């Protein structure tokens, strides 16, 4: 299993590839609450 930091790195690399317009912090934090502490405060 990917660690919290590792998952966060993959997440942001994916965001950079596809664009922020396709992502929503609140939806993602709700879908994966275990990763919420790793998300930068927006």
Swiss-Prot record:
The main place the protein resides is secreted
Question: Which tissues is it found in, per the record?
Answer: Expressed by the venom duct.
- Source species, domain of life: Eukaryota
Single GO cellular component term? extracellular region
Q: Which GO terms describe its biological process?
A: lipid catabolic process
Q: Which UniProt keywords apply?
A: Disulfide bond, Secreted, Toxin
Question: Could you tell me one molecular function GO term of this UniProt entry?
Answer: toxin activity
Subcellular location(s) per record? Secreted
UniProt subunit comment: Heterodimer of an alpha and a beta chains; probably disulfide-linked.
Q: What does this protein do?
A: Heterodimer: conodipine-M catalyzes the calcium-dependent hydrolysis of the 2-acyl groups in 3-sn-phosphoglycerides. This activity may be supported by the alpha chain. Conodipine-M inhibits the binding of isradipine (a ligand specific for L-type calcium channel) to L-type calcium channels.
What name has this protein been given in UniProt? Conodipine-M beta chain
Read off the lineage from the record.
Eukaryota, Metazoa, Spiralia, Lophotrochozoa, Mollusca
């Amino acid at each position: 299993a990917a660690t919290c930091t590792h998952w966060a790195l993959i997440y942001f690399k994916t965001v950079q590839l596809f664009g922020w317009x396709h992502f929503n912090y609140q939806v993602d934090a709700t879908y994966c609450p275990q990763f919420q502490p790793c998300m930068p405060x927006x």
